[in-house]
Each structure stands twice: as C-alpha cells, then as structure tokens.
Design a protein with these regions (language model features):
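Conserved HGGG/HGGXW glycine-rich cap/lid loop of the alpha/beta-hydrolase fold
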Residues: 9-61
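Conserved alpha/beta-hydrolase "acid-adjacent" motif
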Residues: 212-218
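Gly/Ala-rich beta-loop-alpha elbow adjacent to hydrolase catalytic centers
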Residues: 91-95, 99
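Active-site loop/oxyanion-hole signature of alpha/beta-hydrolase fold enzymes
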Residues: 40, 49-90
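Catalytic histidine-centered segment of alpha/beta-hydrolase-like enzymes
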Residues: 236-249
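Short beta-strand/loop motif that positions the catalytic acidic residue
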Residues: 199, 205-207, 211
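Flexible "cap/lid" loop of the alpha/beta hydrolase fold
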Residues: 100, 104-105, 110-140
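Conserved alpha/beta-hydrolase catalytic His-Asp/Glu region
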Residues: 124-126, 142-195
Length: 258
C-alpha cells in the first residue's frame, strides 16, 4: 500500500505485478486488496493498480458526500501520475459502477472494462438493503459481517467456511473500512443509465446468479445496453469475488486477451 497527495487529498493505492496496467476498483466497505485472490489466480502477468475509495485503505476520509465523477477523475489522475496513458479497468460492486463510469468518461484511455456484480441504477430493494447495511455497521461491524456472509455466499461456499467461520467473521469485520457509511450513501444514489451508451471499450459483464443484493437482471441490463459487451454468469452470490476468484480470473483473462 502506498499513497499520493492530489488536490489536498491523500489517495491510497496498491501496486502489484508487472505487465499491462489494470486499474481495479474495490466494492463497498472494502479497500484495494479486494482483488488479491483474482490477481493471484490470473492466467498471465499484469500490473494491478488497486484504487482506494475515500475512507478506505490509505485514502483520506471524505469531508462531504462522495461524487462518483470525482472518484473517477482522481483514479485517472493517479494512472497519469504512474505513467499510464491507456489501461484496462475492472471493478466489483460499487467498483463496477465506477469502472463503467470511467469507461464512459475516458473512452480514449480505457482499453477494456470488466464489471463484476455491477448495476446502472439502484432500485428500491437495493436502497433498502444499503440502508440496512449502514444501520448494521453502526451497531456492530461483526453483526453486519455475519449477515453479509450468510446472504452473500452460497450454501456450498458456507460449507467450505464452516470449520473457520468465526475466525472469518472476525477478520472480515476488522476489515470494514472507516468510509463505509459514505460508500453506502453513494450506493443509494447510483444512476449511471445515461453512461451505458457512451461506453465504447470492449466490456465484460460478470453477474452472480444467486446475488441477493445486485440481482442478476442488473447484469443482463448492462450487457444488453452496452455496445460490444459480453455476459458471463457465475453460480454464486454477491461475494463471488471470494468464492469463485479462479472463475473470475479465467473469464477476465480471456476478455483482456481478446
């Protein structure tokens, strides 16, 4: 983990590997190491630049409500600072929304975009869910994580975690980032519908069939609305990035190779 001072803000990021650069955005409550398992399973070397949202990792805590476009501008400025003119972009959950918006705003710089459990517009059920997350985290991050694991993994995935479940809960709860409430407030406001028609980079949309938070129909909508998009459905819940990292790496590797 390292950081960069930009416009009086500290921007945290991780830098791993060598090769063509990939700008990777994490999901709500997370930090830039969210893509570690996918990176480790990747079929070929890449340079992974993990961007920390405000309030995550080494990034400064937000002083106002988060603005998606400002996050995108900061991330692209970071890539320029690191010497990258063009790059692949990938994102998970809120990070997928950010990656898609990045591809729409900077079509000349984004080589490909990968959306993992992304969506265009937060619907009523999602807004209620995100509000519940805010309340649970405020009460007890461990209570939130017990709910998240129960709802975010498949039964098969929870079977695999069973021998170490309490340890996983404790570790995961300790990783809930200080800026999570701001992330969730942004989640509730998401609407990038108008951006979908502006994305010209090859786009891989990965949806999780058992996702209870971002319904698989959200992935279907992205894939049908974005020119040059392909769809992959994986048999997992929203926490697919932990449960099926190898499958994500394989699909994304094929996408980047093409």
């Amino acid at each position: 983990m390292t950081s960069w001072l930009h416009h009086d803000k500290t921007i945290g990021y991780s830098l791993d590997g060598d090769g063509v650069p990939v700008l990777a955005f994490h999901g709500t409550t997370q930090k830039s190491d969210a893509w570690t398992q996918v990176r480790d399973a990747f079929p070929f070397p890449l340079q992974w630049i993990g961007f920390d949202f405000p309030g995550s990792g080494e990034s400064s805590m937000p002083t106002a409500a988060l603005e998606l476009d400002e996050i995108v501008h900061d991330a692209v400025a970071l890539m320029s600072h690191l010497g990258h003119t063009t790059f692949h972009v990938a994102g998970y959950s809120l990070g997928a929304v950010t990656a898609l918006r990045c591809a729409a705003m900077y079509p000349d710089r984004v080589r490909t975009v990968t959306s993992l459990c992304g969506w265009a517009v937060s619907d009523a059920r999602m807004k209620v869910t995100f509000d519940l997350w805010r309340r649970l985290i405020a009460i007890d991050p461990e209570l939130f994580m017990r709910y998240a694991l129960a709802d975010g993994y498949t039964a098969k995935g929870l079977d695999a975690l069973a021998p170490m479940y309490d340890m996983v809960v404790t570790m995961a709860a300790s990783g809930v980032q200080p800026g999570s409430d701001a992330h969730l407030e942004l989640d509730i406001r998401i609407d990038i519908e108008d951006s979908l028609g502006q994305i010209t980079s090859p786009c891989l949309v990965i949806g999780a069939i058992e996702d209870r938070w971002v319904d698989i129909t959200k992935a279907h909508h992205l894939a049908s609305s974005i020119t040059n998009a392909s769809l992959v459905e994986l048999p997992a819940g929203h926490l697919v990035i932990g449960e099926l990292a190898g499958e994500i790496a394989a699909a994304m590797g094929k996408h980047l190779s093409n």
